Regions:
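Soluble catalytic domains of enzymes that build or remodel membrane lipids, polysaccharides, and related
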Residues: 1-191
Length: 191
């Protein structure tokens, strides 16, 4: 999850998230908003910032999936708003450096603030990573904005990105009450 706050995490805990997803890694680079991972199975080697990103802390944790170690990372890059174009591109370029970490298999999830039409996002994917929605044949996954009364979701800026050799199955866009982003639910075969 992205843009978590202490109050939001407290409400998740009060609602009983730990009964379903008892393992978590939540971090904040500014002390206000953060990003988090929740898991039903233990998160090995949890880290506050796996990417060393200038945009935000992007926490990571490794999950054993049938004997395979898969590193999950919660992504939130800089928004491409006027005055922040360089920072936006840099935050995607920093993610692209992860292609060089060949000793680890990754699944990146979250708000990339970029669509497949953006060159920096495609550069991040390179020849190693794949967008799960495209891999699954789902097509467009418009996920933002969900909170506009007279405007439908028109931007697919949220993604689940898979490492090579993984296969995406079903992909579904789900509105989340109180959020301006929809969630993506994706089934993955890690192979």
């Amino acid at each position: 999850m992205q843009e978590t706050t202490e109050d939001f995490v407290k409400k998740l805990n009060e609602a009983g998230i730990e009964h379903y997803l008892p393992y978590a890694q939540v971090s904040s680079s500014d002390g206000v908003f953060g990003n988090g991972l929740w898991s039903a199975t233990p998160l090995a080697d949890p880290a506050d910032d796996d990417v060393n990103s200038s945009a935000s802390f992007m926490p990571g944790g490794t999950v054993d999936m049938g004997g395979q170690q898969i590193r999950f990372i919660s992504v939130h890059t800089t928004a491409p708003v006027p005055g922040y174009w360089r920072q936006w591109k840099r935050s995607l370029d920093e993610l692209g450096l992860m292609r060089g970490h060949t000793d680890t298999r990754y699944i990146f999830m979250g708000d990339f603030n970029a669509t497949y039409d953006h060159t920096p996002f495609r550069d991040f994917l390179g020849d190693r990573f794949v967008d799960a929605a495209r891999e699954s044949g789902h097509g467009f996954t418009f996920s933002w904005p969900t909170n506009r009364v007279y405007m439908p979701m028109f931007a697919g800026i949220d993604h689940v990105v898979l490492d090579q050799g993984m296969k995406a199955g079903q992909c579904k866009v789900v509105k989340v009450e109180g959020s301006d982003h929809a969630a993506l639910l994706v089934t993955v075969a890690v192979g």
